[in-house]
Structure formats: structure tokens, C-alpha cells
Curated annotation (Swiss-Prot):
Keywords (A to Z) from UniProt: ANK repeat, Repeat
ANK repeat ranges, renumbered to this chain: 38-66, 78-107, 108-137, 139-167, 168-197, 199-227
Lineage start: Viruses, Varidnaviria, Bamfordvirae, Nucleocytoviricota, Megaviricetes
Protein name: Putative ankyrin repeat protein L45
InterPro entries named among the record's database cross-references: Ankyrin_rpt, Ankyrin_rpt-contain_sf
Length: 227
């Protein structure tokens, strides 16, 4: 039914409704993007709606140098914003497809990898690091905020990849103490984090927030008693 409508009518309907979905009912309609005037970028639309098959089709068109891709779809800023959002939201397959499409994983000091670390998506972190992301970008932001948010597996992985647990006056262990992540505190201290940094900030914040197991661990560690 839909493919029997004249192309001119499709153009008018789609421009009026601003609905990308109308172009996704048939691969042949995709080329109508030449004639469309959308306010929203199609990559953004596809990512927000988790349309993996459409992304794969766009990659296919890119690989055969289809002119519609170069002229109408690829917007570097939008690619990077979509990559960051997908890393934050844990959408590994979309992250991979966006990288295949040309998204820059190093943009804004490796922001994509830092967001994946901060929000606890270990598989995305590992994937981005395998692609060359710098785990120490922005003064070890990734391990610091993974520590703050209690992502022990990510903290261990990042340290294994070279993150400095003493960066920014051992900020990682101070945040882990403040937010009550005992196992991360133990791990970081045993890896060399300075739990006495900034006049014992870690134990003070742990005490202030009633994380008494952390207080006990840090006090015992300072006297040579470990459990």
C-alpha cells in the first residue's frame, strides 16, 4: 500500500509530520532523504529509538560510498553526542555501530569511555579501551567516578590498564569512602591510594556519612591491622 503512493506525496507527508519512521517502512524510501527537511538528525532519531537494523543499513550505504550518506546523514557532532549518550545508557551494540559509522571515541578527552565508567558499563569500557581510549584521560576521571559510584569491577579493570589510584590527591579513595563503597576503598588502599590525603579526608567523610565499616578499616589499616 505505502509503496504505491507517489514520491511527491511522501515528501509532503513526511516534511509535514517530521516523522522519520515514514521513511523506514521501505529501504527505497530511505533515499527520499535527499528531498527532506528535518529538524532532527536521523542518526539521533535512530539511536534514541534503538533501531539497530537501520544503523546497519546506514553503515552498508556508507561502505559503498552512497552519496546520500555523505551529503545528508553523517554529522560528526551528532555522531559524538549519540556515542556519549549510548555509552552513558549502556547500549553496547549501538556504540559499536556508531564507531563503525565514524564516531570519534577520543572526542572531548575520551568522554565516551569516561561516561561508560561513571555509569557502570564494563563491556563498553573494555570495548573502548580495546579501540584505544585513554583510561587516564582528564586526570584519571574514569577510575575516580567509577569509585564514587561503586563500580568495583570497572575500578579493578581500569587500574589493571594503568589508571593512577593516587591521582588528584587520591580522589578515588576519598570519594569511595564518602559514598560508602567499602570493597573499593579496600582495593584502592591496597593498590597504593593515600587514604591520609588532605588531612585524612577519606576517614572524615566516611565518618560524617556514617560509613563506620570504612572508618574501622581505615583506622585499622593505619595501625597495621588488616582484615
Amino acid at each position: 500500500m505505502y509503496d504505491k503512493l507517489p514520491l511527491e506525496l511522501w515528501v509532503k507527508i513526511t516534511n509535514y509530520s517530521q516523522e522519520f519512521g515514514l521513511l523506514l517502512t521501505n529501504k527505497n524510501f530511505f533515499e527520499l532523504l535527499y528531498l527532506m527537511k528535518f529538524e532532527t538528525n536521523i542518526i539521533e532519531y535512530v539511536v534514541e529509538n534503538n533501531l539497530l537494523d537501520i544503523l546497519r543499513h546506514i553503515i552498508f550505504l556508507k561502505n559503498i560510498n552512497h552519496p546520500i550518506i555523505m551529503e545528508n546523514i553523517i554529522d560528526i557532532r551528532c555522531l559524538e553526542e549519540s556515542l556519549n549518550a549510548s555509552c552513558k545508557n549502556g547500549k553496547l551494540e549501538i556504540v559499536k555501530l556508531l564507531v563503525d559509522l565514524g564516531a570519534n571515541i577520543f572526542h572531548n578527552e575520551n568522554c565516551a569511555m569516561m561516561l561508560a565508567s561513571e555509569y557502570g558499563h564494563i563491556e563498553i569500557v573494555e570495548y573502548l579501551v580495546s579501540k584505544g581510549s585513554d583510561v587516564r584521560a582528564d586526570n584519571d576521571y574514569a577510575v575516580i567516578y567509577a569509585s564514587k559510584n561503586g563500580h568495583l569491577e570497572i575500578v579493578k579493570y581500569l587500574v589493571s590498564q594503568g589508571c593512577d589510584v593516587r591521582s588528584c590527591d587520591s580522589y578515588a579513595v576519598r570519594l569511595a569512602s564518602e559514598y560508602g563503597h567499602l570493597e573499593i576503598v579496600k582495593f584502592l588502599v591496597k593498590k597504593g591510594a593515600n587514604y591520609r590525603a588532605l588531612n585524612h579526608h577519606a576517614v572524615i567523610e566516611a565518618s560524617k556519612n556514617k560509613h563506620y565499616e570504612i572508618v574501622e578499616f581505615l583506622m585499622n589499616y593505619s595501625t597495621g591491622i588488616t582484615k
